[in-house]
Amino acid sequence: MKDKIVRATAKDGMVRIIAGITTNLVNEGCKIHECTPVASAALGRMLTAGTLIGTTLKSEKEVVTLKINGNGEINGITVTAHSDASVKGFIGNPYVDRPLNEKGKLDVGGAIGTDGILYVIKDLGLRDPYIGQVPIQTGEIAEDFAYYFTASEQTPSAVSLGVLVDRDLSIKAAGGFIVQMMPGADELLADVITYRLEEIPPITTLISEGKTIEEILEYIFDGMDLKVLDSLTPEYKCDCSRERVEKALISIGKETLQEIYDDKKNEEIVCNFCNTKYEFTNDEIGELLNNSR
C-alpha cells in the first residue's frame, strides 16, 4: 500500500484532522539508520509526527524541526519536515536494545526517557524561528505531542502514532493522526471523539488489515460529516548536497579549516540524515580555505 497523508474536517469544521499511512517512509528511514526494533518504533513515530505537522506549514520555504531529547539510551531524535510532507530524521543511538515493557510492547518511553524536553521549532521565514517546548510526559512520543499542542499551542488534541516492526526488522505498518478541536467546539463532541479513539484498534492493526487512511477516518468519524480536503504523498527525503557540505565546512572557521588542511589528509563528511558520504581531497580543502578568506 502506498503512503498517503490526508487533511480533513468533521462536524462542520469543528474538528481538524491530519492523518496518514507512513509505512514506506518509516521503513526507508529505519533502514538508512540500521535501527533496532525499539529504535525503529521511536524514529518511526517521530518521522510520522514530522510529516503530519509539516503539512500544516503554509509555504514550501517554511520548515519545522522536531526534537525529543530525553535521558534514555536513544540520546535524542531530530526530525525536519516540509509542507510537501517530505521528512528526514536523525537518531542519536539507533542500536539501543531494551526488554519489552510491562504491556509486552517495545519500550519506546524507556528508550527515550522521561526526563527531558520536546521541542517544536518552526522556521517561517521571519527573523527568528518560533520555538515551542514542553517537558517530556511519557517518552512514548504521541502523548508528548498531545501535551505540546494543548499546553504550548492551546489546541486540545488527540495524537496517535504507531509503528509495527516485523520479524525481519522491516516496517510492517506505520501511521498516525492528529485530531484537533477548533475554538467553539462542543465539549460533548470532544468526549465522543475521545471515546471512539480509545475504543478503536491500534492504527497499525488497521493498516495491517489493508484499510486505507480514508477508511480508517470514516470508521472513527462515522456520522460526523467527515470531509477529506486534500491528500499528499509523504516521503523520506534528504536535501543534503556537496554544495551544502562545502558551506558547512567553510562555516567552521578558518582556523579549524587550516588545521584540517595542515594534516595533509583527505576528509570524509557523512550526512547524519541519510548517511551519504562526501569525500574531499586535501587540495579541495585548500580551495575551500582560500574561498573563506
From Swiss-Prot:
Gene Ontology molecular-function annotations: protein folding chaperone; unfolded protein binding
Cysteines joined through disulfide linkages: C238-C240, C271-C274
Keywords: Chaperone, Cytoplasm, Disulfide bond, Redox-active center, Zinc
The keyword Cytoplasm appears for this protein: yes
PTM per Swiss-Prot/TrEMBL: Under oxidizing conditions two disulfide bonds are formed involving the reactive cysteines. Under reducing conditions zinc is bound to the reactive cysteines and the protein is inactive.
Subcellular location as annotated: Cytoplasm
Annotated Gene Ontology cellular component terms: cytoplasm
Pfam families registered for this protein in UniProt: HSP33
Keyword Endoplasmic reticulum among record annotations: no
Signal peptide span: none
Top-rank taxon, per record: Bacteria
GO BP, one annotated term: protein refolding
CDD domains registered for this protein in UniProt: Hsp33
UniProt similarity note: Belongs to the HSP33 family.
Function: Redox regulated molecular chaperone. Protects both thermally unfolding and oxidatively damaged proteins from irreversible aggregation. Plays an important role in the bacterial defense system toward oxidative stress.
HAMAP family noted in UniProt: HslO (MF_00117)
Protein name: 33 kDa chaperonin
Organism placement in taxonomy: Bacteria, Bacillati, Bacillota, Clostridia, Eubacteriales
Gene that this sequence comes from: hslO
